[in-house]
Amino acid sequence: MTASTSSSYIGRFAPTPSGYLHFGSLVAALASYLDARAVGGRWLLRMEDLDPPREEPGAQAAILKALESYGFEWDGQMIRQSDRHDAYGEVLNRLFQQGLAYACTCSRKQLEPYHGIYPGLCRNLGHAQDDAAIRLRVPELEYRFVDRVQGEYRQHLGREVGDFVIRRRDGLYAYQLAVVLDDAWQGITDIVRGADLLDSTPRQLYLQELLGLSQPRYLHVPLITQPDGHKLGKSYRSPPLTEDQAPPLLLRALRALGQKPPADLDGASVAQIMAWGMAHWDAALIPRTLSVPEAQLS
């Protein structure tokens, strides 16, 4: 499946301010940016600040500064999910009133034996919304989609996920609900992101279907992993992006995405590297794997 034409493509990058951008973030951002710009599409920026307790002070400003110093130019104003709570609440209440969602008072300890697959303990108990998580009822159906890099992906929502949380017990809205509503609101046609979100996609497809929303195309790029197999990330103290390393790290990110920048780009400026990337971007060259060890990258 190919990306949209230039007249209709709208992509996005949606970082979480729980820490600074690192090399793994750069790979995902670069893939989404080049996939949009290569066809003359728009590229939007969204700050996924749904979880204030986990937000690192100064992270939002640092993320914007890093993107700018690495040559990313977004269209329009950045939006913040923290400004969208009314929209999330309106849809959540509608789902609850229609019987498509319900309140759940299960504790983490109660759910430990079920290994992340919710068994429906509160499904028919009729709890009030107060001091409870809100879960979306899922059908006993298998959802499938064809990812532009990873190929066909299938997941049975009932057996492999169970009814999933759309608002946490502490009142914070869950990622699955927010991302679906924001992508639709912004008119996103193409989602390019890390392969760690591949298994979230069927839940999002179900929500889109339930709410009558259009479904974007998806492209999940391989995660960059450390020697122990963990992905690069804030949880593992991956070093933040620094401005002085922008040109070599952009070239390294291009190679991680299977692109083939020529040797004469060594020593080039950020603008020159980005221009080459936009002119030569080929999503078909992205490795069709879930991860790429950082140690393999030159």
From Swiss-Prot:
Q: Binding positions for Zn(2+)?
A: 104, 106, 118, 122
Give residues annotated as binding L-glutamate.
Answer: 12-16, 48, 175, 193
Cofactor annotation remark: Binds 1 zinc ion per subunit.
Q: Where is this motif: 'KMSKS' region?
A: 231-235
EC number(s) stated in the UniProt entry for this protein:
6.1.1.-
Motif 'HIGH' region mapped to chain: 15-25
Q: Does the keyword Aminoacyl-tRNA synthetase apply?
A: yes
Q: Where does ATP bind?
A: 234
Q: Can you cite an annotated GO cellular component?
A: cytosol
Cofactor(s) needed by this chain = Zn(2+)
Please give a single GO biological process term from the UniProt record: glutamyl-tRNA aminoacylation
UniProt keywords, alphabetically: Aminoacyl-tRNA synthetase, ATP-binding, Ligase, Metal-binding, Nucleotide-binding, Zinc
Matching entries from InterPro entries are given as:
Glu-Q_tRNA(Asp)_Synthase, Glu/Gln-tRNA-synth, Glu/Gln-tRNA-synth_Ib_cat-dom, GluQ/Sye, Rossmann-like_a/b/a_fold
The enzyme class is: ligase
Identify the Pfam families for this entry: tRNA-synt_1c
Gene3D superfamilies, from UniProt?
HUPs
Highest taxon listed in the record's lineage: Bacteria
The molecular function terms in GO held by this entry are:
ATP binding; glutamate-tRNA ligase activity; zinc ion binding
* Record keyword Zinc present: yes
Q: Say which family it is in.
A: Belongs to the class-I aminoacyl-tRNA synthetase family. GluQ subfamily.
Summarizing the function annotation, the protein's role is: Catalyzes the tRNA-independent activation of glutamate in presence of ATP and the subsequent transfer of glutamate onto a tRNA(Asp). Glutamate is transferred on the 2-amino-5-(4,5-dihydroxy-2-cyclopenten-1-yl) moiety of the queuosine in the wobble position of the QUC anticodon.
Name the PANTHER family on file: GLUTAMATE--TRNA LIGASE, GLUTAMYL-Q TRNA(ASP) SYNTHETASE
Please report the name of this protein according to its UniProt entry.
Glutamyl-Q tRNA(Asp) synthetase
The organism named in the record is Pseudomonas fluorescens (strain ATCC BAA-477 / NRRL B-23932 / Pf-5)
